[in-house]
Amino acid sequence: MLKSVIENVHALEIFDSRGNPTVEVHVTLSNGVVGKAEVPSGASTGENEAVELRDGGSRLGGKGVSKAVNNVNTEINDALKGMDPFDQPKIDQTMIDLDGTPNKGRLGANAILGVSMATAVAAANANRQPLYRYLGGIDLEMPQTFHNVINGGEHADNGIDIQEFMITPIAKTSFRDGFEKIVNVYHTLKKVLEDMGYETGLGDEGGFAPNMKNSEEALKALHESIIKAGYKPGEDIGIACDCAASYFYNKEDGKYHLEGKVLTDDELAAYYDKLLDEFPELMSMEDPYDENDVEGMVKFTATHKDRIQIVLDDFICTNPALLKKAIKEGAGNASLIKLNQIGTVTETLETIRMSRKNGYNTMISHRSGETGDTFIADLAVAINGGQLKTGAPARSERVEKYNRLLEIEEELGKGERLAFFPDDVDHD
């Protein structure tokens, strides 16, 4: 039987969960098998992220993606026709070379990523394998999940500067059992916030966006909700924060303007220590310092790496070269993985491999502008013992990922997943 090759690559403009245009791609193979992917988009973006190609002009507020769509349907389609869909590295490198820029800005990272993801899906479908199996092989584990239930920063219009307050199931259990605990805490949190006199409108990622005074108030609400839901903070349910410090860092004075205070690196560390002392269930912090504040991040890592997980997002932008630099400098102990920060499946997997090889945990992440695409759920399982954050257990574009994980767990037939920060994961 003849080997299947790529017959056609087609894109169209669709809309994400924030009502902004994004790219959907269909890759059709010569045997009739099709792979589909939808590309997400972020609200808070790092300086070194691969570049989304937007149209500009007056249409759709300048956010249209017809140029990216056209690039898929012309240049990329012409370049990939007849290629082997199972050679993902070659497919991705062909598009990188075709683009010819260091940040995928000519063809658009949104165009390239859509094709990269859809090709992987098509190859998995052609193999009659689920995507997680195609990407990950045999040894698979359900991921540790992190759920953004109180939104601040760029994700909500309120007074909280820290961007995300997450809850995570930390007792060894099935994914389903852990997720049910999260759902219970989420609904309890709504009642707690209402009792505190706050509105319970939702932010971009399905979390509540109460107009609180400061981060301590948000953490107190989470602590109380965990207990009222019948669980033990730090034993059943943990807390994590995405500080997104670049958004309260002032480049002019080199200080952090956080909730009415102006803080130096050391003063910010002292502020974080106060939170950690008051809330020992706080187990993970993402981007606690500005993406260009290498000194602050390295110093914080040296003093806190054995106490909490320090996740690098804007600091590395899922870029192997930036991760290599961070490892050499001693920054962080975990990598946040966002497909659209780097723009191809191959480079994403390279960043994951480099992280694991150097003892860094890996957390797969959604973006604030999401679709119903569940690629990241399969990816989180494929990497075996990783972590996943994809919003609250609300809003369909978030819940789709969790429902996909429930399906995968049913298929795997496993009743137990890894505990928080497993020390028995093979990082090689």
UniProtKB/Swiss-Prot annotation:
SUPFAM superfamilies cross-referenced by the UniProt entry: Enolase C-terminal domain-like, Enolase N-terminal domain-like
UniProt-listed InterPro entries: Enolase (IPR000941), Enolase-like_C_sf (IPR036849), Enolase-like_N (IPR029017), Enolase_C (IPR020810), Enolase_CS (IPR020809), Enolase_N (IPR020811)
Any GO CC annotation of this UniProt entry: extracellular region
Keywords from the UniProt entry: Cytoplasm, Glycolysis, Lyase, Magnesium, Metal-binding, Secreted
EC number: 4.2.1.11
Record's catalysed reaction(s): (2R)-2-phosphoglycerate = phosphoenolpyruvate + H2O
Enzyme's top EC category: lyase
Keyword hit for Manganese: no
UniProt cross-references to CDD domains, sorted A to Z: enolase
Active-site residues from the entry: 205 (proton donor), 338 (proton acceptor)
Location(s) in or outside the cell: Cytoplasm; Secreted; Cell surface
Pathway(s) the chain acts in: Carbohydrate degradation; glycolysis; pyruvate from D-glyceraldehyde 3-phosphate: step 4/5
Amino-acid positions noted as binding Mg(2+) in the UniProt annotation, renumbered to this chain: 242, 286, 313
GO molecular function, one term: phosphopyruvate hydratase activity
GO BP terms: glycolytic process
Binding positions for (2R)-2-phosphoglycerate per the UniProt entry: 163, 338, 367-368, 389
Cofactor note: Binds a second Mg(2+) ion via substrate during catalysis.
HAMAP family recorded: Enolase
PANTHER family for the chain: ENOLASE
Family listed: Belongs to the enolase family.
NCBIfam families, A to Z: eno (TIGR01060)
Role: Catalyzes the reversible conversion of 2-phosphoglycerate (2-PG) into phosphoenolpyruvate (PEP). It is essential for the degradation of carbohydrates via glycolysis.
Protein name: Enolase
Organism this protein belongs to: Lactobacillus acidophilus (strain ATCC 700396 / NCK56 / N2 / NCFM)
